Amino acid sequence: MENKIEVNNKDEMNRWFEEFKKGNGLVDTFTNSYSFCESVPNLDRFVFQMASATDDAQKDSIYASALVEATKFCAPIYECAWVSSTGIVKKGLEWFEKNAGTIKSWDESYTELKVDVPKIEQLTGYQQAALKWRKDIGFRVNANTAALSNKVLAEYKVPGEIVMSVKEMLSDMIRRRNLILNRGGDENPRGPVSHEHVDWCREFVKGKYIMAFNPPWGDINKSGRSGIALVATGLAKLAETEGKGIFDEAKKTVEALNGYLDKHKDEVDRASADSMITNLLKHIAKAQELYKNSSALRAQSAQIDTAFSSYYWLYKAGVTPETFPTVSQFLFELGKQPRGTKKMKKALLSTPMKWGKKLYELFADDSFQQNRIYMHPAVLTAGRISEMGVCFGTIPVANPDDAAQGSGHTKSILNLRTNTETNNPCAKTIVKLFEVQKTGFNIQDMDIVASEHLLHQSLVGKQSPFQNAYNVKGNATSANII
């Protein structure tokens, strides 16, 4: 078996794709990037099947079947070919050999991360490594393989018949988000921060230093119920939505304020001025500490970079460019026929290739005690095999034309369009998957609701499985559904 996607750069990729497209009748009516999707998947029968299911194993199987049906033909073929091409496979795997130091903070602790929640440094270390990997190997070939830095969508337009369902999903996502933000593990518990405080901080970091003389709450050093200065909690909250760069802006504003006070020293009480500058810098430092320990940052940093994690798992399993086609074929077959966790683990252990057992050994421990939403994004689970699937299993690289048979992997849904001209097939499909889940399970009792996670990915602006959203600013659950 050999990798037939012999591509090392964008020009070669374009030539390969044009040839492939001619012979395979790809379309982009319902998808952002060309795919085999000729119609929006109909999942109604799975709702009916779920209604009569009697046990969890049966329900899991029905949902797995619905997922495959929903995603079988909608993967972005150009980008999937790029991710599996000979050039990216070679560079993607070699990078890990050369960058042991870059991944050390979490790679060395992999065994512990299989059973326990990561430290915030291990999450941010992962995200920095993912961005470095993308840059170093030249992963970006177009916007669909980019690292995003936009703001979350302010508006999300959906067909009238699913507005209420999307709002129901958002409501549950907000409930979960609040549970996370208010969990007991924060080192710095703090109550809700008012819009007024955040708005003041936003103006202050823009350089309006005179505002420090008279904040709306009175004294610049006033504390809230938590005993923490309101300036600090306001800045920390602002950083959660606008990024940590606001701390540097805040320091610049304080420098400008100090310059103003120096310039007018004859009209200034020096002791009061020095005290104000010292305290403002102290409040900024406290805000940085709050931000670093915040659950919002933890949630943001726990997002999986699908391509980076998938390559990391290949590397850990000892896959080489020569054995890569066997992994690709295995994942392609996995996406054709839905399998439960047990069957999938059995399939991994049954393959004669060494990587099968090694991938199995990478799986998170069943004794992982916490909510699985906190799990490190580099830890492999049965569910996350689908991340590898969308990368390497959409097109079996030894026989690329077989991709026309379809292979379903969850994140392919992000390739479905969200525009109103096509009636937002992405949201419609996600809502139908939610309906399937809701019919069989008590949504409130679930750690992770897969369909809600997909909606969240769509709201942060992802239009492809291969985009990194770590630097996307804002809160996705604030989107206005219209």
From Swiss-Prot:
It comes from the Viruses. Its main location: virion. Changing H453A: Loss of DNA endonuclease activity. Keywords: Capsid protein, Helical capsid protein, Hydrolase, Ribonucleoprotein, RNA-binding, Viral nucleoprotein, Virion. Gene3D superfamilies: 1.20.58.1110. A motif (DEVD) lies at residues 266-269. The record marks D269, R270 as: Cleavage by host CASP3/caspase 3. This is Nucleoprotein. It comes from Crimean-Congo hemorrhagic fever virus (strain Nigeria/IbAr10200/1970). The gene is N.
